[in-house]
C-alpha cells in the first residue's frame, strides 16, 4: 500500500491542502474520504465496483446524519449551485469520491474560489471540462468524534456568503 503523508508548517486551508494531495496522486485512481467517522470505509468496495461508470464516482449521503441547520443551508446552496452549474450530482459537497488519474491531472491547478466549499467547486470545474459523474448512494453515519469547526451554526452564514461569492466568481469571472 503506497501512502504519502503531505504536511506543512503553515496552515494552508482545506482547499489548497486538497489540491496538494490531488497533485501528488500517482496511482490510476484516487479515493478521497473524510476522516470524521461519518463515511463507512466498507463503501470503498462499492466505489471500486462502479469505477468504470464515469470519470468521477461521487458519494451521495442517502440518509444524511447532520444537524438540521446544516441540511437547510446545504439545500439552499444546492438550489443555487444547480442553477449556476447544473452538475448532475445529488450531493456535490460530499468528500467521498473516487476519480481516475486523468481527473487528477485535469483538475489540480486552480486557485480555489470557495475555500470552505472545495468539493462544490471541484465538481463544478470537473463538469466544465466535460468529465462524467456517477452518483453512489452511501450510508452516512453520525459524527463519531468532536464537532465541526467550520460549519458550526454561528459560522455558517459567513461560510455560505463566501461560498456564494465563490460560485459567482467561478461561473462569471473564471
Predicted regions and their residues:
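Acidic donor-binding segment of Leloir-type glycosyltransferases
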Residues: 1-6
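Acceptor/aglycone-binding surface of glycosyltransferases and processive sugar-polymer synthases
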Residues: 8-24, 29, 41-116, 143-164
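A short, conserved beta-strand element in the Rossmann-like catalytic core
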Residues: 36-38
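DNA-recognition element of transcription regulators
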Residues: 120
